[in-house]
Amino acid sequence: MGRIQYIFILGLVLLVTQVRAQDPNGSHAITPEEQQAMAAYLKNYHQYTLRATPVVPPGPVRTMAEWEPIQALILSWTGQPTIQREIVRAAVKECKVIILTSNADNVSGILTNAGIPLDSVTFLNEPFNTIWVRDYGPWTVYKNDIDSLWIVDWIYNRPRPQDDQVPGIIANYLNLPIYEATQAPYDWVHTGGNHLPDGLGTLFSSNLVLDENPGKSEAQIDS
């Protein structure tokens, strides 16, 4: 990974995407209860998540830029059907759409009644904690710039184990290798909303990534 530039970013982000009961529209910010639970969650992390063997990619990779073309868009379908319906309407014209839902028939009906074709839509009956898939979903990297497509993941910065399993679920569905920064010395607590790569070796992030990885220096995170 190229050098990470630590900056403060303020902007609008399109959100498509227990140690608590499922609350699909739950808080984006970490709650006081979750703050208290985070240390124990990290200590027992691999008990909470269903993962492949946590290893880093076998060689240099290029992280996909924020604005590069995508093969698929992922949504966690919750109690925001009007907004999510219109996201799907726009997305199916450009790419495949993968929807995580506990009720595929209901979602299918909503989309069909709105005149949205389902040819490019896949429903996965998988659990999740919240709507914020931008933060916990998979990220893609390429070997040799545009060669092999792989999925990468890290430890989500919320104690929400069902959310944290989504990258592995997507990797299994797409039959793609998944590599994870979840085991020392490469373990890394992070969130997709604080992860803005340019595709050329620079990753933009706020100082939050330093706060959430107190055992690592800026140089270690850069590397």
Model-found features: residue ranges?
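Positively charged n-region of N-terminal signal peptides that target proteins for export
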Residues: M1-Y6
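Bacterial N-terminal signal peptides
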Residues: I7-L15
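The feature marks the mature, well-folded catalytic cores of soluble enzymes
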Residues: Q22-S223
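Sec/Tat signal peptide C-region and signal peptidase I cleavage site
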Residues: T17-A21
